């Protein structure tokens, strides 16, 4: 049976560590100008029910760099617009392509598609998780600090899909997540790992950041939330990552943001544009991690690493 990549909690530490090592290797080879095109004749279908910049470009570019082709589909241009079921969509598309990436809202739609698909399915984002983003982030941390095992990652802001993937990764890979969220915007207990040793809660952003190796956040307009944005931003104002928060972290702490960012809201300009910020390396590494992931799903482990 083919593998899917839907949620980090479904992966083993061996699998994730292999993918991270392989992504770093593929990036190195790409930067050296080496041509590596194992996907000649392979096709990736990219199904978008949510808008995207980085997800689309990174998957499309990654497939091209590996010698394959990517086909872009959105809801408005498919029969999903006319209420064709996600199951029937999966049954049809998966007979025509080698791999499918889906960016959607309800995680259950992703799971329903994967259940009927004849080819591997990748989670490009749901309201519950964003595994490719977090694995690209972890790859970036490893490049800068060699290992994430035992590290402290601080999340500042409301609990969302990216945080849930951080928690799953922490449970599998052995690091700790410190969380500080506005009242009413903390985690949903049904969406966190059973291993509660991998995270702690703090009332203030500064307390959460104390001793952190990495501070990360997301914008206050997170995918999947349609409530009044003014109310959300008002409640979140105290949870901005700024110079005060970063000073509470370790002196060499990194700052990450999954983007898009809104300077002056969830993060101050002096932090995201400052020397501790690695957001552009982080954005680039989505490309390289996803190349390693697609290679693994289509070809299995490659041992020249």
Feature map (PLM): residue ranges:
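Glycine-rich phosphate/diphosphate-binding loop of Rossmann-like nucleotide-binding domains
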Residues: 49-61, 143-217
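A short, aliphatic-rich alpha-helical micro-motif
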Residues: 94, 114, 148, 208-210, ...
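Short, structured coil segments at secondary-structure junctions
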Residues: 66, 96, 116-117, 173, ...
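Positively charged, low-complexity intrinsically disordered leader regions
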Residues: 1-57, 61
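Adenosine-phosphate binding glycine-rich loop
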Residues: 252-253, 258-305
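Rossmann-like adenosine-cofactor binding region
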Residues: 193-270
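Phosphate/diphosphate ligand-binding glycine-rich loop within oxidoreductases
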Residues: 38-142, 263
């Amino acid at each position: 049976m083919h593998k899917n990549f839907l949620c980090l909690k479904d992966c083993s530490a061996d699998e994730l560590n292999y993918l991270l090592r392989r992504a770093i290797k593929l990036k190195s080879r790409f930067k050296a100008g080496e041509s590596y095109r194992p996907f000649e004749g392979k096709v990736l279908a990219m199904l978008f029910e949510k808008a995207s910049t980085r997800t689309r470009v990174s998957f499309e570019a990654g497939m091209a760099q590996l010698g394959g082709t990517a086909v872009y589909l959105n809801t408005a241009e498919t029969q999903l617009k006319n209420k064709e079921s996600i199951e029937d969509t999966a049954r049809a598309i998966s007979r025509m392509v080698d791999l499918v990436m889906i960016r959607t809202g309800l995680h259950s739609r992703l799971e329903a598609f994967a259940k009927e698909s004849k080819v591997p399915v990748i989670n490009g984002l749901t309201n519950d998780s964003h595994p490719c983003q977090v694995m690209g982030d972890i790859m970036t941390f490893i490049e800068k600090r060699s290992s994430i095992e035992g590290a402290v990652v601080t999340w500042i802001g409301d609990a969302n899909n990216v945080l849930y993937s951080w928690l799953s990764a922490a449970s599998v890979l052995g690091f700790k997540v410190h969380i500080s969220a506005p009242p009413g915007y903390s985690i949903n207990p049904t969406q966190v790992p059973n291993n509660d040793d991998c995270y702690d809660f703090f009332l203030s952003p500064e307390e959460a950041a104390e001793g952190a190796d990495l501070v990360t956040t997301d914008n206050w307009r997170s995918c999947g939330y349609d409530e009044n944005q003014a109310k959300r931003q008002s409640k979140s104002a105290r949870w901005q990552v700024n110079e005060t928060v970063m000073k509470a972290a370790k002196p060499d702490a990194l700052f990450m943001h999954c983007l898009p960012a809104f300077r002056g809201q969830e993060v101050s300009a002096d932090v995201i544009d400052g020397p501790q910020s690695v957001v552009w390396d982080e954005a680039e590494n989505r490309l390289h991690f996803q190349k390693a992931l697609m290679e693994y799903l289509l070809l299995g482990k490659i041992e020249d690493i």
